[in-house]
Amino acid sequence: LLLGAVSAFACDIDEKAVDIAYENAALNGVGRDRYTVRAGDVLSDPALRREMGGGADIVAANIVSDVIIALAPAVRPLMNPGAIFLCSGIIDSRAEEVRGALEASGFTVEETGRSEGWFSFLCR
């Protein structure tokens, strides 16, 4: 939102993430009228998908490799054409496995980040 988006919808499986998202937005001067944060599983909850209001432009997953591998094929249909899937929290010993799973799910890894034994991938 600070980079120009008009609005945002965020969903996290962890209810604590909702409160943290609201706190972080407030610290950055972003009013609640510009975004919605929900707890739940957008992959299995049709009501959350409806509230999302269409495909996502950005999906972020900062979580362990096994979850990213399982999530990759399921999240693809929820994304708009050209959308970004940003994955992080990938330990170096699993990076190639995760990259392979992303590519097998139809993603193209456009950028790779590496820091202190951890990887991130920016995919489309």
Role assignments for model-derived ranges:
Residues D57-A70, G89:
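A short SAM/SAH-binding and catalytic strip from SAM-dependent methyltransferases
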Residues V18-D19, I68, A95:
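Short alpha-helix immediately C-terminal to the canonical SAM-binding loop
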Residues L43-I58:
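A short acidic, Gly/Pro-enriched loop at the edge of an enzyme's catalytic core
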Residues L27-R32, P77-M79, G106-F107:
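Short helix-capping segments at alpha-helix termini
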Residues L1-V42:
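Conserved SAM/SAH cofactor-binding pocket of Class I
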